[in-house]
Amino acid sequence: MSTIEERVKKIVAEQLGVKEEEVVNTASFVEDLGADSLDTVELVMALEEEFETEIPDEEAEKITTVQAAIDYVTSHQA
């Protein structure tokens, strides 16, 4: 099984149509990876599905970087 970090990066790459090597922990979804608001909503939905969790809208708005996504998923795993 892949680590949470690897799984998050794979989802980000797939959802945003970028190469996995571009998905570094410090990358901003919008500024560095070219995501728009719809992309970020779809990304959150993909993370919810992959990690079987629900991310409230107010929390989703704070997830703006790859590291923020990793941190959120790590802290909310059952």
Curated annotation (Swiss-Prot):
Name of the protein described by the UniProt record: Acyl carrier protein
InterPro entries: ACP, ACP-like_sf, PKS_PP-bd, PP-bd_ACP, Ppantetheine_attach_site
GO biological-process terms attached to the record: lipid A biosynthetic process
Any GO molecular function: acyl binding
Keyword Oxidoreductase listed: no
TM region positions: none
Family: Belongs to the acyl carrier protein (ACP) family.
